[in-house]
Amino acid sequence: MSQMNALLIILAGAFGMVFFTEMRRRRALRGFWDRACMGIRWRRRFPDSPKTEIREFLSVVVGAFGFRPSRRCCFSPDDKVMDIYRALNPSVGLPDDMELETLAERLEEPYGVDLFKSCREDITLGDLYAQIKKSAG
């Protein structure tokens, strides 16, 4: 086998792996993207919070995960942070874009919340928002 053929096989395998991972990611994220606006759930769970505060928090979340700002309405207070992370990074062992570290940094600076200190496997966006409200109040 020539070096050129070997290189083509390696490139085809790498392309296939990237393509497969991207298809898994899109399928996993579709569960979030196909939802109607979750604003009503946020307002029911946090009736005393102004919409602008909730939107600001969700903007931090979608920014940390690298999603478009318009996607913030797709997330519910019951969504687990790790479910979002795993939907974005479906393949174990591949490098990620450090979304959790970015989220932790963006929550600590303005809100004083240490994500890694308070993080549990099942922590939800609503739990994080409640911590922010508690630290502000």
Give, region by region, the residue ranges found by the protein language model:
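Phosphopantetheine-dependent thiolation modules in NRPS/PKS and related acyl-activating systems
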Residues: S2-E109, V113-G137
